[in-house]
Regions:
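A short, exposed loop/beta-hairpin motif centered on an aromatic-Gly-Thr core
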Residues: 15-23
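Eukaryotic short linear interaction motifs
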Residues: 15-16, 29, 61
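Short, mixed-charge low-complexity intrinsically disordered segments
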Residues: 37-79
Length: 79
């Protein structure tokens, strides 16, 4: 089974604020969109500072780990 790993890059701190697993790009983007609308979350406080990337895929049957960085979400400023 393939596991996909994602990261939320903080443009101000110049590091990943969060790294974790998600089912696919759409479910990761949905999570980011929900947090972007909630000002109680770190993303919601300043969404324009964050970009979401798919970072890697891991196959738990073969042990293959593939690094690749693909932008799948970008925060937009609060209106």
């Amino acid at each position: 089974m393939e596991h996909l790993y994602y990261g939320i890059w903080d443009n101000v701190a110049k590091c990943y604020a969060w790294v974790g697993e998600s089912k696919n790009n759409a479910t990761f983007a949905r999570m980011c969109n929900v947090m972007e609308k909630d000002e109680k979350t770190f993303i919601g406080q300043s969404p324009q500072d964050y970009i979401g990337y798919q970072l890697a895929a891991f196959n738990d049957e073969t042990g293959e780990f593939c690094n690749h960085k693909e932008k799948v979400w970008e925060g937009k400023p609060n209106e």
